[in-house]
């Protein structure tokens, strides 16, 4: 379902609504030894470096019908990466764009060791958070993406692409609309599209793989959906190890530990 492209409301002046999508995914992995844990973090750090994240966010920008004005990206030591993209709803002439903006030109980005930029009402950001504890056999990886737009552009249009771009065991999605615009008669409009649930914008085949629940505050235009993977195929959660190397009893124990970790992350509570 595309928003902001069809059945347009007749507005007076600029559409001043700000639409923000906050998208967090968690990937969980069994890594028993310290070596496995460090190897997993190194793998994730390489797999989701700032260059790949930049490509994902540029695709998101195209999908929501916006245009790149500026890219700021950075890889961190010992791990993690961040990317921020300033976007505009309409194409701007080069002479109209602030000289501090790089228009996402790769040759400009490659001439700098550290790249910084500025934010605007319309922007796309991503941060990564690999994590493990030496006393725990489970490592996790979180990706935090924010897409904030003003005008007719809606970040919900890129939701399925974002979900498909990452291996996600737990997904939390927040969507809110702020501000107001006016119709031609001067009546305030606090939202310019119909929505009852974020799940309405998620592919059915994706939803079948997850248990999903909503917490919505309709009068405040706040929508929240969180999703937990239904089936655990153990081989997908082992790092540098074959499932058949593990005894059946230990397999069951590992699956239980993985599920407990996922449930706590999903609920946001220390349960076990």
UniProtKB/Swiss-Prot annotation:
Gene3D superfamilies: S-adenosylmethionine decarboxylase. GO terms for cellular component: cytosol. The active site is at residues 122, 127, 150. GO terms for molecular function: adenosylmethionine decarboxylase activity. This is S-adenosylmethionine decarboxylase proenzyme. Pfam families: AdoMet_dc (PF02675). Belongs to the prokaryotic AdoMetDC family. Type 2 subfamily.
């Amino acid at each position: 379902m595309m928003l902001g492209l069809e059945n347009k409301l007749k507005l007076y002046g600029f559409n001043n609504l700000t639409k923000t999508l906050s998208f967090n995914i968690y990937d969980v992995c069994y890594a028993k030894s310290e070596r496995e844990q460090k190897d997993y973090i190194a793998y994730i750090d390489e797999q989701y470096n700032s260059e790949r994240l930049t490509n994902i966010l540029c695709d998101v920008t195209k999908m929501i019908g916006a245009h790149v004005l500026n890219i700021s990206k950075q890889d961190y030591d010992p791990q993690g990466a961040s990317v921020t993209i300033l976007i505009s709803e309409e194409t701007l002439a080069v002479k109209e764009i602030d000289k501090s903006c790089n228009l996402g030109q790769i040759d400009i980005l490659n001439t700098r060791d550290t790249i910084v930029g500025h934010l605007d009402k319309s922007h796309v950001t991503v941060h990564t958070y690999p994590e493990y504890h030496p006393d725990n056999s489970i490592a996790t990886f979180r990706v935090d993406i924010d897409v904030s737009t003003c005008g007719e552009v809606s970040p919900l249009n890129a939701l399925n692409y974002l979900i498909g771009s990452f291996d996600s065991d737990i997904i939390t999605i927040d969507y809110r609309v702020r501000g107001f615009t006016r119709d031609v008669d001067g009546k305030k409009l606090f939202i310019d599209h119909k929505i009852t649930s974020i799940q309405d914008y998620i592919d059915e085949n994706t939803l079948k793989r997850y248990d999903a629940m909503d917490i919505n505050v309709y009068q405040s235009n706040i929508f929240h959906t969180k999703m937990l993977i239904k089936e655990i195929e153990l081989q997908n959660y082992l790092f540098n190890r074959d499932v058949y190397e593990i005894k059946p009893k230990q397999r069951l124990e590992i699956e239980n530990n993985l599920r407990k970790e996922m449930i706590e992350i999903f609920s946001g509570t220390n349960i076990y």
